[in-house]
Each structure stands twice: as C-alpha cells, then as structure tokens.
Regions:
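N-terminal glycine-rich, Lys/His-bearing helix-loop that initiates the first secondary-structure elements
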Residues: 1-47
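Conserved N-terminal alpha-helix of the aminotransferase class I/II PLP-enzyme fold
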Residues: 35-79
C-alpha cells in the first residue's frame, strides 16, 4: 500500500454495519467495565481495552496504529 493510502485508511477497518470509512469520534471520558476484575485487569495491562480517555480511547488507537503503519513500526503512542 502507498503511504498516502495508509495515511488515510491505515489502522482502521470500516464499520461492518454502516460501512463508514471515517474514524468515529467518541465523546466520552470513561468506559464501563464488565466487573471489578475486568477493571483491575485493564489497569494492570493484562487485557487490552479502554480505561479513561486521557489514557486510551478508540480514536487515538487508530491514530497510533496509522502512524505506526506509515513508519513500518509495530505500535505507536500518541501523547
């Protein structure tokens, strides 16, 4: 894939229901946990997931994956 294509589409798979190709903006600051153990596992980094929007959120996750793909890396970190 060309870098221009990766810059626009990398790190995101279109929603299967809506077929939307634009990355959604999640207007939330907190995420629900399945139970207390799930919350503990998230904070201990035992499982991947969203905890709090300043730490990780789906929109930043796409940015990190997209930049990593453009640079040939395995991961990224948006600060």
């Amino acid at each position: 894939m060309k870098i221009e294509t990766i810059a626009v589409h990398g790190g995101y798979t279109p929603d299967p229901t809506t077929k939307a190709v634009a990355v959604p903006i999640y207007q939330t600051v907190a995420y629900a946990f399945d139970n207390t153990q799930h919350g503990a596992d998230l904070f201990d980094l035992k499982v991947a997931g969203n905890i709090y929007s300043r730490i990780m959120n789906p929109t930043n996750g796409v940015l990190e994956a997209r930049v990593a793909a453009m640079e040939g890396g395995v991961g990224g970190l948006a600060v």
